[in-house]
Curated annotation (Swiss-Prot):
Residues 118-353 are annotated as: Spermidine synthase. The active site is at D269 (proton acceptor). It comes from Bifidobacterium longum (strain NCC 2705). This is Probable polyamine aminopropyl transferase. The keyword Lipoprotein does not apply. It catalyses: S-adenosyl 3-(methylsulfanyl)propylamine + putrescine = S-methyl-5'-thioadenosine + spermidine + H(+). Pathway: Amine and polyamine biosynthesis; spermidine biosynthesis; spermidine from putrescine: step 1/1. GO terms for molecular function: spermidine synthase activity. Signal peptide: none annotated.
Length: 446
């Protein structure tokens, strides 16, 4: 951009401020902010020992595009500034460019002032009222190094959410029954396994799955791993996490790498909201999980998004897991009225047909095994309903959809799934808006 010629009559404001003289000027097509500063290359630091640095920010008033130019004049031994200048230009780099642009064009000053007042007011009030200021039943609201955290105390349950507006990360039921969430479907894992004596939970949260396992399998030895220490603290304070369950604050994959223990059930629930960490989605990770299962053991993975079709995130995860556990050993089950899908993968055990995944997942066998191990008729009949939702996952025909440590684009695949979910949810409203206008849309959302 060509720098405009500035005359004395173009100067709008100028003053000395500390060690810098600040000037704002405006021409027909350009505006600029200029100030002299002083920079020292060596001690002692001070204006008398420093070079002069003239900084000029120029903005084209017609386009809003700007650039910043520096002129450095070295100080000579006699104290005067050299006429030799060292200059450099950085286009569109200065944070002052938008400010200069809006001041120079005098655009919508009232709107700018109102917006600034609202911004300042909400910035001051939000730390006092909390992010979810509309909630009236919050027991806790805060942040950890990993998450926004919200504990809500309802009449029948206490829930933990890691999102301001939606979603439930963990829940504890005050009547100690089933939760109505994906944890209930995941209770099929101990019934699918050859034995149900031990369990590892990667992504312990506040211990929802651990509490359910303890309720229905009281003799089971359970170990938890949770990366967020603050969530573990909240589990003890608000969610009655069983005190006899050891919980380690660590990354799930790193914990597996350091452990030699084996388990009958491993729950992978380390996916935050609707995001999936790539290091816990690859063949290398699932191979590590498989090695920590006893023969006949079952891994259950909570997938937060129901996304089908070629190239989807669920296809990639399912194919990756099936490639590790072998053909016929992987099942999925969608969770009703949610966007969750549970995936079960079994490590071959004794080799007998009756212990295979195909046999164990049949409704009658799943019911009988559940009742024999838990004595709960409610859970027994619920498992029959779960069995009706099982879908077999075959090994992939090619390696194109298999995720590895070298190639796991789960962020991109996840965003595609989110876009599809939003499109599906917004579809009916888009049609109402088209047919009935804004009035019809307002009536529809009331």
């Amino acid at each position: 951009m060509v720098e405009p010629a500035i005359g004395r009559n173009h100067i709008r404001a100028g003053r000395h401020h500390g060690r810098a003289r600040i000037v704002f000027a405006r021409t027909k097509n350009h505006a600029y902010l200029s100030h002299d500063a002083y920079c020292s290359r060596y001690p002692p630091i001070g204006r008398e020992n420093a070079d002069r640095l003239r900084i000029r920010t120029v903005v084209d008033r017609r386009t809003g595009r700007g650039a910043e130019r520096w002129h450095r004049s070295p100080r000579q031994a006699n104290g005067r500034f050299s006429n030799q200048r060292y200059s450099s230009t950085s286009p569109n780099s200065s944070p002052a460019c938008p400010l200069i642009y809006f001041i120079s064009i005098k655009a919508k000053r009232i709107a700018c002032v109102v917006s600034a007042v609202i911004f300042v007011a909400t910035s001051c009030v939000s730390p006092l009222t909390g992010f979810a200021f509309w909630e009236t039943n919050l027991a806790y609201e805060g942040e950890s190094i990993y998450n926004y955290l919200q504990v809500k105390n309802l009449s029948d349950r206490t829930i933990l959410s890691t999102n301001v507006l939606f979603g439930v990360q963990s829940v504890t039921m005050k009547d100690k029954g089933l939760t109505g969430m994906y944890y209930d479907t995941a209770l099929a894992a101990p019934a699918l396994a050859d034995n149900a004596n031990s369990a590892l939970i990667l992504g312990m949260g506040t211990g929802t799955y651990a509490r359910q396992l303890k309720q229905y399998y009281p003799k089971m030895n359970i170990t938890g791993v949770e990366i967020d220490q603050k969530i573990t603290d909240l589990a003890g304070e608000y969610f009655d996490e069983p005190a006899d369950i050891p919980v380690t604050t660590y990354d799930g994959r790193a914990w597996l790498a350091a452990s030699h223990d084996k388990y009958d059930v491993i729950m992978v629930d380390a996916y935050q909201d609707i995001t999936i960490p790539f290091q816990m989605s690859s063949t290398e990770f699932f191979t590590m999980v498989r090695e920590h299962l006893n023969p006949g053991g079952v891994m259950v993975v909570n997938m937060n998004m129901i996304s089908d079709g070629q190239g989807s995130i669920n296809e990639a995860l399912s194919d990756t897991i099936a490639s590790v556990f072998g053909n016929g050993n992987t099942l999925t089950a969608d969770v009703p009225n949610t966007t969750n899908r549970e995936l079960f993968a079994k490590k071959p055990g004794s080799g007998s047909e009756e212990n295979s995944m195909q046999q164990a997942s049949k409704a009658l066998n799943l019911r009988e095994t559940t009742y024999e191990r838990t004595g709960s008729e409610d859970l027994e009949w619920y498992m029959e309903e779960v069995a009706s939702r099982f879908r077999k996952v075959n090994e992939p025909d090619s390696a194109s959809t298999i995720l590895t440590d070298d190639k796991a684009p789960v962020e991109v695949l996840g965003m595609h799934a989110i876009d599809q979910i939003i499109a599906d949810e917004a579809g009916p409203y888009r049609q109402i808006l088209k047919d009935e206008g804004f009035g019809g849309l307002l009536r529809a959302v009331q």
